Structures are given as C-alpha cells and as structure tokens.
C-alpha cells in the first residue's frame, strides 16, 4: 500500500505523530509517497498514493468549541476520487467532534474515509502506534 501524509502542526505534536505513523507504516511494508503540510501539499505524492492520511490539531476553548485546525485548507486539497483516507487529530484536553468534522471534510473531496483516531498529545507514541495498527488491520492485504 502506498500512503501520502498531509499534516498541519502548530507546536510539533501533530508533525511528530505524522512522522511516527509514516515510520511505523514503512516498518510493516507500506511505501510513503510523501509527508507534506496541508497548506503546501505534495500533489505528486497524493496522486501516487492509494491511501491519504490527513492529520491536524484541535483548537477551541478548553473543552467546548473544539474543531480541527485548517479545515479551509483541507477542503481545498485536490480531489481524491478512488482513494482511501484515514484521519487523525492531536489534542490536549478533549477532541470533541473534531474527527467527525475532519472525516466529513475529507469525504467531500471524494475519498473513502475508512477510519480515524484522536491522539492525546501526552501519549503521541502509543496513540500513533494504535492508529497504524487499526489502519493496517482495516486494509485488505494486496497480493
């Protein structure tokens, strides 16, 4: 499976998670076509990928009004018809409905979103590993 990662990070936590996810996917035999910022996407890596992984951070007022940062930029990514996608967000206190909003936005680009996970910034490594495990388990093995 070939995957492209599109990341929006403010403090580095989401980038750290994305890098960990890319590394873990490579360890199980996936090819990473590129890791780029949502606002400066690598169009070639998106085109070459079977799976698009979109990650961003949660913004909001403590435990109310949470939303994925950069939804506008995400909604302007290129069309992803025929591609599968997975989403993740990093959060401090509560992700709220961030994954639902992120899933909806990526789905509108034409991708089939097969899952997502909210990663607590205090547990980036463990939650990134869980994300990869769930993602790999949800994708049929290609022969």
Indicate where each model-derived feature is located.
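Extreme N-terminal starter segment of soluble prokaryotic enzymes
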Residues: 1-4
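FMN-binding flavodoxin-like domain, especially the glycine-rich phosphate-binding loop
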Residues: 13-16, 22-35, 48-143
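Short acidic loop-to-helix transition motifs that present clustered carboxylates
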Residues: 36-41
């Amino acid at each position: 499976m070939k995957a492209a990662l599109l990341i929006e990070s403010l403090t580095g936590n989401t980038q750290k998670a994305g890098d960990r996810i890319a590394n873990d996917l490579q360890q199980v035999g996936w090819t990473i076509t590129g890791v780029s910022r949502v606002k400066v996407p690598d169009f070639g890596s998106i085109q070459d990928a079977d799976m698009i992984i979109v990650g961003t951070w949660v913004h909001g007022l403590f435990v109310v009004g949470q939303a994925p940062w950069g939804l506008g930029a995400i909604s302007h990514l290129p069309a992803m018809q025929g591609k599968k996608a997975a989403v993740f967000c990093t959060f401090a206190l509560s992700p709220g409905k961030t994954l639902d909003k992120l899933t909806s936005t990526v789905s509108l680009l034409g991708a089939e979103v097969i899952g997502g996970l909210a990663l607590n910034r205090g547990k980036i490594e463990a939650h990134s590993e869980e994300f990869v495990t769930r993602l790999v388990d949800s994708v049929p093995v290609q022969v």
